[in-house]
Swiss-Prot record:
It comes from Caenorhabditis briggsae. Plays a role in vesicle-mediated protein trafficking to lysosomal compartments including the endocytic membrane transport pathways. Believed to act as a core component of the putative HOPS and CORVET endosomal tethering complexes which are proposed to be involved in the rab-5-to-rab-7 endosome conversion probably implicating sand-1, and via binding SNAREs and SNARE complexes to mediate tethering and docking events during SNARE-mediated membrane fusion. The keyword Transport applies. The gene is vps-16. Residues 1-20 are annotated as: Disordered. This is Vacuolar protein sorting-associated protein 16 homolog.
Length: 858
């Protein structure tokens, strides 16, 4: 067994930064076998953390805020701070707390002794509550666990050993599980494997019981192949990937096993320290565990799966100041001491290769070449670059290492190395990865500043993503940083900027509305000026959204001040309707000359006001009145009381054009011939009053023709249907032609169709014997339509001329023949139309398509 010591990592010679800045000194490192741990001092002079008097401590994963609970006489108080010490909430009272922890949704969970859990935001606002008090007696211990949905669950064990579980804190549904033994377990945990139910693992000395929701606890007999039954297990911790569990026995043995307890990957025994009596135990990345012996001593142990039985155990111990606390991150741990915050992480392969100048590592040679270039020794730089075998891998290693380092000077040099290597590639380099890395490093460095206090690592950043980072900044009230980050990541007009600004507006308005401040007109105008001045810097952000936030906060006068600045008419009208200021909305919609806005207001009126009220309001605006009439007509309200009211409105407004259309609609849907005729006559009178001679003449003809249709008993038939019906009576056809003022071509087409329909083939043939002014394609089409197949070829043979032949072939669905005619004429438009019609024939369509392609290629 060998203990390692820390060494300082060579830096680029940069001077230390001022107090309370990120990364005061270069990172130090230590090798634990095949693992290298990096120790980075994130912040110094963090006396405001005041760790000495802390009773309960919890740090949010992914470098989020920390929460501490202090005890005062007869009371408890919660303080929430960033890691750099900036206070987010102070002196928040709580009752009999026994446990605090952060969820992955950036919320603080405070569990009281009686089993009541409060869920708070990162600035101490109450979000929800979870009541375990009906399920458990006094709380003994508690565990939180990550879920597959990205949220957190909680498991609470009472003094009787019963476990109550909530799979998701945001949607609390409690279920419980009771072990078969009366004593409490020596170790236990809760976890949710990927795409599986929540599992509870209880260990009674060397007996392992596991169960999930809906099942009872079962003894895990298959674990006997690796369980040490001569001792008892005192700790068990699930890794961040939820695939392995680290077990610890009271005699100092650490075992790494699979999540289903079927396989033991690694066993390590530490004899230099009595680790079985530790106060904290957990993972550092994937291959190292830490054991906190006391508030001032922590041991790190290599538990890599690559260790072989009999290999020397590698560990190291570090001493810390008194009252130190540890928080676990997905890629490392964070040490909170009295005067500093330090991050411990297991280095990636790329970082080890580049920064340790490993032999035969292309990334290390490229980094050395960049350093030589920076120092002005170009010949040495060229010499270092010539030994690189895989330049693309070297570039990727330097970019990855730049993202993983903390010192800005070192980041710049590594990025320069990557850019330098691109000059030696055989193809045009793809700079996408480099540009993305520069953008992400810029964001990370901004987040790590003391004023923000989120020392996020690149690996953590990649896990939670851009949106989650911006959400966390919003939760903490860091709006200026959130806007800056959103602009860097998505550009000036990205949706994230809008979201940040509107959340700032909401919180600013809510803060004022909850206060005892008198909200008179000057105060509202001052708040309007403050918020508008900021929003107007971002033209893509709608003032209407700010007005909606004011409405939600029950400050309608403030909303009216906001909406005056809104330039989009649609948003302006929508907010006025929310304010129930209908007259202003109607005036604004009419002034915009946009019918859809007026429709929107009219519909709102029809659903919220009485008919007399909204018709009176609409009658004052002519355009609104016209659109209202359209709306009623479209909805079919043209009968009964609504019809008479509509007509009265039109007559009152002397709107003869709308009156004409109104009577047309009545005539169209009226089934009574007499009423239909009356409607047509009223339409004619309205057209006459309107002074439109053309419409008046048309209506005069229609109203004169309608009585004759009634006399013939054909009131429900159109002119076309009538001629088809009497096609074999030439006298009646001639009479109807004169009455309806039809042209010869139209009458001929309908007569052909009528004779074919009635089977009057002799009359049809006599008609065809005369020279047809419309060709013979209509004869073919009529015979095909009414299945007079024996007559089709007779008329098809008479067809002549290009258009007549094409139409006749189309009537017979001879698409290929029609296409050939069009192809010979080089008539692409007709050929394309034939191709579109041929799609219903899968045999002919490809051949027509071939002719079309041939014409396009010619």
């Amino acid at each position: 067994m060998k203990e390692s010591t820390r060494t300082s990592t060579p830096s680029s010679g940069a001077k230390p930064k001022g107090d309370r800045e990120i990364c005061l000194r270069p990172s130090s490192s230590v090798f634990l076998g095949d693992q290298q741990l990096y120790f980075t001092q994130e912040y110094l002079a963090t006396n405001s953390l005041n760790m000495k008097y802390v009773v309960y401590f919890a740090a949010c994963q992914f470098s989020g805020p920390i929460a501490v609970i202090y005890a005062a006489p007869k009371s408890w108080f919660i303080w929430i701070r960033t890691i750099s010490g900036r206070i987010l909430k102070r002196d928040l009272p709580c009752t009999d707390p026994v446990f605090i922890d952060w969820t992955r949704a950036h919320c603080l969970l405070v569990l009281s002794k009686n089993g009541r859990a409060q869920v708070l935001s990162s600035i101490g606002e109450k979000v929800s509550e979870v009541f375990f008090d009906n399920q458990v007696s006094d709380v003994h211990e508690c565990r939180t666990f990550a879920t597959s949905r990205g949220d957190s669950g909680i498991a609470v064990m009472d003094v009787d050993g019963q476990v109550a579980v909530v799979n998701s804190v945001s949607e609390p549904v409690i279920w419980s599980m009771r072990p078969p033994y009366s004593e409490l377990p020596t170790a236990w945990t809760a976890f949710q494997p990927h795409s599986q139910l929540t599992h509870i693992l209880l260990i009674f000395e060397a007996v392992f019981l596991m169960g999930c929701q809906g099942e009872s606890l079962q003894v895990q007999n298959h674990a006997s192949v690796w369980v040490d039954s001569s001792t008892k297990y005192v700790k068990c911790v699930v890794d961040d990937a939820r695939s392995r569990i680290a077990m610890m026995t009271e005699n100092g043995k650490i075992q790494i096993v699979s999540i289903d307890l079927s396989t033991c990957f690694c066993t390590v025994e530490v004899t230099e320290h009595e680790i079985g009596k530790c106060i904290n135990f957990g993972w550092v990345g994937n291959s190292v565990v830490f054991v906190q012996m006391s508030s001032s001593l922590t041991v790190f142990v290599n538990v890599s799966a690559r260790r072989k039985p009999g290999d020397e155990v590698r560990f190291m111990s570090i001493k810390m100041t008194a009252n130190a606390r540890i928080s676990v991150e997905p890629d490392g741990i964070r040490l909170f001491e009295s005067t500093r915050v330090e991050f411990v992480e297991a280095a990636s392969r790329e970082k080890i290769a580049v920064l340790n100048r490993s032999l035969n590592e292309d990334g290390a040679y490229l980094y050395k070449a960049a350093q030589e270039m920076e120092q002005g020794t170009g010949h040495n730089s060229f010499a270092a670059s010539t030994v690189i075998q895989d330049m693309y891998k070297a570039i990727d290693d330097c970019i990855s290492t730049a993202c993983d380092t903390w010192q800005p000077e070192e980041q710049k040099l590594l990025l320069k190395a990557a850019r330098f290597g691109m000059a030696y590639t055989n193809t045009t380099p793809d700079t996408t990865k480099l540009m993305r890395a520069i953008k992400e490093i810029r964001v990370l460095n901004e987040l790590r500043m003391v004023r923000t206090g989120i020392p996020l690592t690149h690996r953590q950043y990649r896990i939670i993503g851009d949106t989650c980072i911006i959400n966390r900044l919003i939760d903490m009230g860091s709006y200026s940083v959130a806007i800056k980050v959103a602009q860097w990541l998505g550009g000036e007009n990205c949706e994230s900027v809008d979201r940040v600004l509107l959340e700032w507006v909401r919180r600013s308005i809510s803060k004022v509305s909850r206060s005892n401040m008198k909200m008179d007109q000057p105060a509202l105008e001052a708040l309007d000026e403050k918020i508008s001045a900021k929003l107007l810097q971002f033209p893509h952000v709608s003032m209407a959204d700010a007005a909606r936030r004011a409405i939600e906060a029950k400050l309608p006068e403030l909303a009216r001040l906001f909406i005056r600045r809104e330039t989009d008419d649609e948003s302006h009208v929508a907010v006025l309707l929310q304010l129930n200021d209908v007259s202003a909305a109607l005036t604004k919609a009419a002034a915009s000359q946009r019918p859809q806005l007026i429709h929107q207001v009219v519909r709102h009126l029809m659903t919220s006001e009485s008919r007399s009220s909204y018709e009176l309001a609409i009658s004052r605006i002519p355009l609104a009145q016209c659109l209202y009439q359209d709306l009623v007509r479209q909805e079919g309200e043209t009968r009964g009381i609504s019809s008479r009211q509509m007509l009265a409105l039109l007559e009152q407004a002397s709107d003869f054009e709308r009156q004409t259309l109104f009577h047309f609609d009545v005539a169209e849907i009226e089934r009574n011939p007499s009423e239909r005729l009356n409607a047509l006559r009223r339409a004619k009178d309205a057209a006459k009053s309107m002074g439109d001679k053309a419409i008046e003449e048309i209506l005069n003809d229609v109203s004169a023709f309608a009585p004759l249709q009634i006399q013939r008993g054909q009131a429900d038939m159109s002119v076309r249907d009538t001629i088809i019906e009497i096609a074999d009576d030439t006298a009646k056809v001639a009479q109807l032609k004169q009455q309806a003022r039809l042209n010869d071509k139209q009458v001929l087409l309908w007569t052909i169709e009528g004779l074919a329909k009635k089977g009057k083939m002799e009359q049809l043939f006599d008609l065809a014997q005369k020279r047809s002014p419309i060709g013979y394609a209509p004869f073919v089409k009529a015979c095909v339509r009414y299945k007079r197949n024996e007559e089709v070829n007779k008329y098809f043979a008479k067809a002549n001329g290009y258009s007549d032949l094409v139409a006749a072939n189309l009537a017979k669905k001879n698409y290929v023949d029609a296409a050939k005619l069009a192809y010979d004429r080089r008539d692409r438009e007709v050929l394309h139309a034939i191709h579109m019609k041929s799609h219903d024939d899968p045999v002919q369509c490809p051949r027509v398509k071939q002719l079309l392609n041939s014409m396009d290629q010619a």
